[in-house]
């Protein structure tokens, strides 16, 4: 590796429309909950995840979503992953896709306040097309992770159609 010889204050002075969210910023957004508050008061998220052989990604991301504080979580998975997810994350609402092994049909998103898509999703062409249909015109905050980002890597001409309220979580 070679040092590219940037001055130490370059990052602080460089203009960019992008930024990295730090832990302190997130902690300041978390509000304390009342002891007997209803779960419905803390939002309903949709997680579209998993494909055949990748059920673990949907399980881990569902647990992480619940730990983040969402009140209700619906996880949309291929039919083949239903029983495994329902057994390992019983507090999640499990919804199945029309396909046995991968995401192939967009989901109605009217009742959700946030959507995440990508963990273990796979990159089948049907999945890529369904994902693009799903995210276009998405009216709520959207998190793209893992295979959702990889799909944009193989369909670079779709980048211009990425929604504005979109958070990317790449593996660096």
Positions of the model-derived regions?
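Small-residue (G/A/S/T)-rich helix-start motifs and N-terminal tracts that mark the onset
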Residues: 1-146, 150-172
